[in-house]
Amino acid sequence: MVKINGEDVDAAGVVLGKYLDDNGYNRLTIAVERNYEIVTKDKYDDVTIEDGDVIDVVSFVGGG
């Protein structure tokens, strides 16, 4: 089991980029932290989510 944004998710073995795409995240407007380390955008398709990972996806919102 994996914890993503505080929720238990069965995503072990899934490539991070695929998870983000499948769940509607816009890669241009998010930052991803995996096990307390930032994952750079160029690595999203190289990282496989592993059992026990803790992932936070943060979206940037503009406004004025």
Model segments located where?
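Ubiquitin-like/PB1-type beta-grasp interaction modules and other compact soluble beta-rich domains
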Residues: M1-G63
